[in-house]
């Protein structure tokens, strides 16, 4: 997705490092679900080398290191502070590479490549898939979670700002030349908050703000709060926020 400012994203996530683990409720659920799917898919796979793209502070890393503790792992994240935190879960030989996963010249080959809640930030997800295919042999597994249209839809409907999320059809097209799709499953995760301001606080503390600070003025915040309550209040008076994750697993073709 063109136009994404990765330096701005890196700064946001760096600021959110200390609060992310406490606030990222949806992402934690996604990691738990993803670990279950991955365990089934890789049951007969011998994993000697593995790469995690966008490891963040290690929410998925912790599961992965327990599941594939004998593998030589490479951990990557755009944010240097995050990957340093994630590396605390390392159980064996672990290589740490911070930087833009779309620009890094990957030279090693990996039996398993995984990513949780990261590729939605990529400018060219189709090119990223081709790059991953180049560092996997036949039978290698690529497993990732990302988000579909409908994610943070409440924010977008009011502010007209947010990411343009690819559809499952987009992902199938991009994968088709390189991988056989093993799994594509999606779900909806709905969080509730006391107030619309708590929604914005949640997004800020997880680094996934859909709007920049420069967008907000006092009057805009007031208008946002009124609109959010009107449109997205639950019967108990709380307000909702929707995530629409998808889990994708595929096997490298010949």
Feature map (PLM): residue ranges:
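N-terminal, positively charged/glycine-rich alpha-helical extensions of SAM-dependent methyltransferases
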Residues: 1-19
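Conserved Class I S-adenosyl-L-methionine
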Residues: 23-26, 59, 164-166, 183-254
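Conserved alpha-helix/loop element of class I SAM-dependent methyltransferases that forms part
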Residues: 26-46
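Class I SAM-dependent methyltransferase SAM/SAH-binding core
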Residues: 49-104
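A short acidic, Gly/Pro-enriched loop at the edge of an enzyme's catalytic core
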Residues: 102-113
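A short SAM/SAH-binding and catalytic strip from SAM-dependent methyltransferases
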Residues: 112-125, 146
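A short glycine-rich, Lys/Arg-flanked "PGG" loop and its adjoining helix->strand segment in the class I
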Residues: 126-138
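Conserved class I S-adenosyl-L-methionine
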Residues: 143-168
């Amino acid at each position: 997705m063109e136009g994404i400012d990765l330096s701005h994203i890196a700064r946001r996530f760096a600021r959110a490092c200390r609060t992310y683990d406490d606030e990222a409720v949806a992402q934690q659920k996604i990691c738990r679900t993803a670990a279950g799917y991955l365990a089934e898919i890789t049951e007969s796979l011998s994993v000697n080398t593995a790469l995690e793209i966008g490891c963040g502070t290690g929410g998925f890393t912790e599961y992965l290191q327990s599941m594939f503790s004998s593998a030589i792992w490479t951990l990557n994240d755009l944010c240097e502070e995050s990957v340093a935190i994630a590396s605390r879960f390392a159980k064996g030989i672990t290589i740490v590479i911070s930087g833009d996963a779309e620009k890094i010249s990957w030279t090693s080959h990996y039996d398993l490549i995984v990513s949780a809640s990261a590729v939605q930030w990529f400018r060219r997800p189709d090119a990223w898939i081709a790059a991953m295919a180049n560092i996997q042999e036949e039978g290698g597994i690529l497993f990732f979670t990302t988000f579909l249209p409908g994610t943070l839809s409440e924010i977008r409907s009011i502010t007209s700002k947010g990411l343009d999320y690819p559809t499952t059809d987009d992902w199938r097209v991009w994968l088709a030349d390189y991988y056989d799709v093993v799994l594509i499953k999606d779900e909806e995760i709905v969080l509730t908050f006391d107030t619309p301001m708590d929604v914005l606080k949640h997004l800020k503390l997880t680094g996934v703000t859909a709007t920049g600070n420069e967008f907000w003025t006092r009057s805009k915040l007031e208008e946002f709060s009124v609109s959010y309550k009107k449109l997205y209040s639950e019967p108990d008076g709380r307000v909702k926020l929707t995530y629409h994750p998808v889990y994708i697993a595929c096997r490298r073709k010949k």
